[in-house]
């Protein structure tokens, strides 16, 4: 973005949006991951889960869950597919539980 000041154009410095800056509460993380789950692109769920884990700290989550840090990076980069027990450990660590309900018509 830029604006004019006495005939000169001054550029405004901006930084890229980092969603992790907004994932400080369990409620925010749940809402974010839930929206990603309902996205048409199934990769969005893992991207959102990865952002939530990164907001807490990958090393910390790896230590608390017993999962390898490198394995987590592979999952979140899309180069590895996680097993259900891995997803469950990550969600549990973030304080999130999944429940099922019938679809509304």
Model-derived segments and spans:
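N-terminal flexible/basic segments that precede or flank functional cores
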Residues: 1-51
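Recognition helices and adjacent regulatory flanks at domain boundaries
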Residues: 23, 38, 58, 100-102
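Alpha-solenoid HEAT/Armadillo repeat architecture
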Residues: 38, 54, 77-80
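Short basic helix-loop element that most often maps to the first helix and adjoining turn
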Residues: 45-64
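Residues in the helix-turn-helix
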Residues: 60, 71, 86
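Recognition helix of helix-turn-helix/homeodomain-like DNA-binding domains
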Residues: 66-82
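DNA major-groove recognition helix of helix-turn-helix/homeodomain DNA-binding modules
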Residues: 83-101
């Amino acid at each position: 973005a830029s604006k004019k000041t006495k005939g000169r154009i001054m550029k405004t410095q901006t930084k890229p949006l980092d969603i992790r800056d907004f994932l400080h509460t369990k409620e925010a993380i749940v809402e974010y991951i839930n929206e990603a789950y309902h996205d048409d692109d199934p990769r969005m769920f893992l991207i959102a889960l990865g952002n939530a884990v990164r907001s807490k700290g990958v090393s910390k989550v790896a230590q608390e869950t017993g999962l390898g840090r490198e394995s987590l990076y592979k999952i979140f980069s899309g180069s590895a597919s996680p097993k259900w027990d891995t997803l469950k450990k990550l969600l549990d660590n973030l304080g999130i539980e999944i429940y099922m309900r019938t679809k509304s018509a």
